[in-house]
């Protein structure tokens, strides 16, 4: 089936063919010796410096024998000045008259060699002595323009288009690129903090025979050679604990996790988390470590602990506030749920108009009350501690109250950011907790945990006292970049598949029997 081209796309393909006709390959294979970035040239400007730059040509002002254009590389933009007789020293002026003026388009990649100078108005620029075509774009970019007053016109702002075509979004919206650069810096800072304490970065399986470590619905796939079902991991917790059993004192992992659940502004089916486990520590130590780590990250990435999140200013300066879960519910509802059974909790939910269903046990009911009535009130970083034991099947019972657990969740701007335990290391207690989860599954709770027999076997060999913590990288990036949607901090967020023209090949048709 013929591809439907716009008028601009047709013209660009004609230009591409014209380049080849005059002996210029629009997609050359040879290395181009870039030695400078535009950002550095402008921030550390030295007049008369010889430079080699490459990037997209963005904007062009043709003025007879001389022209100005903007060159955009990975670090920013700089003005370039092109004189016909400078780049065409002989009688043949094709490179300027035909290639630069007629056959190059907005968005094409070019390479230039030249010398830095300041224009009469003081703008850092590059006087071009050599021009090379590096890559021809056959599809036009959105023409986003900014006027002298800083107003943006024809902006590329439609969220669905931006998320589907992130490659375009990154080119024309500099703030988007800045968000992802900060995301990378956040992860680097976190990694440096943890390795600086001597902890080992590890990798654990993504495909797992038992989806454990969290209460969530998994994605299921099938391994043909083994003829068995496998699950995309919902968490990496149980494998990291196996490594603690194996003798490591501190491990951490930046892990992709997958949960087959709904999507909204704070949830994507595929997301990134960091989990860490350290021996001979408890959840109180982990609270201190978590707040120290977040304060360090803020200073490394932003230079301040104060962050604007929507209308709120949030301060990540340690120490953070501590509030028990039962205390939080009492503070915001006036009801003390301590010691209540399931029937009493259902009455509380009815009174507070918290929606619940018959599949929910005590833990889920308490979680729903907290989520509906309390969570959104915690704007400043706050550790919610001491969760009821029914909510935390992998967590050690509280040393002072066996009905509670040594667990905290860190709330920021009304959302959970991190979750941590004094880890349960009693294999007999752990088996009983898993069996309670099976009962919940029998009642219809599709987020109840599976029994992982191999993990129980590992615990039976002995696991030292350990504290573990997991933190959502996507959500942390949202907070530190001031974004209110997780789609803004994931390069390619999950979306409904795009409908292409009929006649497009079915990807499954190209799979062998063993790969379907």
List where the protein language model places each region.
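Class II aminoacyl-tRNA synthetase catalytic cores and aaRS-like
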Residues: 1-516
